[in-house]
Amino acid sequence: KALSKSASQLTDADYVAVTAPADGVITELSNLGSPNSYRVVINHGCNLYSVYMVMNKVTGVLASLASQASNSGYLKTNVKVKAGEEFGRQGTNMLDFNVFDGTTWLPGFQNPQAYLTLDTWKPYTADYLPFFSSEIRTAMEAQLQKTSSPRVGKIDYDIAGTASGNWFLAGTNGYAGRLNSEYENATTMIGSGSVPGKNDYSWSHLAIAPHQVDTKAWVFSSGWWLDPKGDADQAALVVASGQVTPDKLTASSGMVVYKLAQLSYTPPAGVAENPPGSMAPWPIGYTIITGRERGVVALQVNADGSLSLELNTSITSISGFTAFTAAKRTYN
């Protein structure tokens, strides 16, 4: 309910408790760059971790660290927590929650090397529902927007030899967004974080995948939209009648040009749309619709499995794009 209000209308009573899903040790409390955005990591043992992102307030068992956390980018902690104990509060935005199981690798990631330099935990992302009791699981499922299986969604859509999945710009070393040449010529240790000359590490990222809720729709998401330094954006990738879907686009398909359009939604029958300005989640079971046209993108899977693309936001007609130009990029 708090997300239906503007930030200026929120009171302390609107913030809800963030509690531990199981016994464990809080090993990290990080400030994500603003006074109301924190990351918390809980180690539950047996290589199982739960991670909370963009948490608003540090409270409960972490209250004594609140002041220190607000002034520090990263705190390594050792705070025991019991299932159900509060360690934070949430009110101004949705809370990210993930479970990582270090014993299980997501089978839909085709490029393990890409995750060695940053977000090394991502390939271990787990479906968290089976870890909860039937009572809690039922309550959680009742709030999930996606009504089809898997209810928590999917991030590993890599299909070798097709355009589907997660990609990284050729010449870069995966998720961290650093150039291979930096590693080849390094004389000191290269860390993660900011990339020299770029606005964000995601400048080199690309994803072409089904929408996280309405999997009939395809999404084109690029860390480099118009600015080669990085200006992440995404749009609906519109598969026209007679066109092959990205998961069926192979080297034999040649170059295929798709329209891009603004992503929007329509609620299920009988459910009202969110009011303008609302931060509340879109309604459960919504479907994707497209808005204004945002250009075209040409895709071509190469014989070596790499992907060539060219994004053109100045034209909206598929027939207006006939061949790659010097603006073509290649991803692995």
Give the ranges of each region predicted by the language model:
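Zn2+-dependent peptidoglycan hydrolase active-site motif and core
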Residues: 21-73, 95
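Conserved "cap/hinge" positions at secondary-structure junctions
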Residues: 22, 28-31, 85, 90-91, ...
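Tryptophan-anchored aromatic micro-motifs
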Residues: 159-178, 182, 307-310
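Short glycine/threonine/proline-enriched tight-turn/helix- or strand-capping micro-motif at secondary-structure
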Residues: 1-20, 29, 143-154, 181-205, ...
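N-terminal glycine/threonine-rich, aromatic-flanked beta-hairpin/loop signature
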Residues: 177-254
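Extracytoplasmic
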Residues: 13-15, 21, 35-37, 47, ...
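Conserved, short, structured surface segments that act as functional micro-motifs
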Residues: 37-44, 70-156
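Beta-sheet ligand-binding and adhesion/scaffold domains
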Residues: 235-332
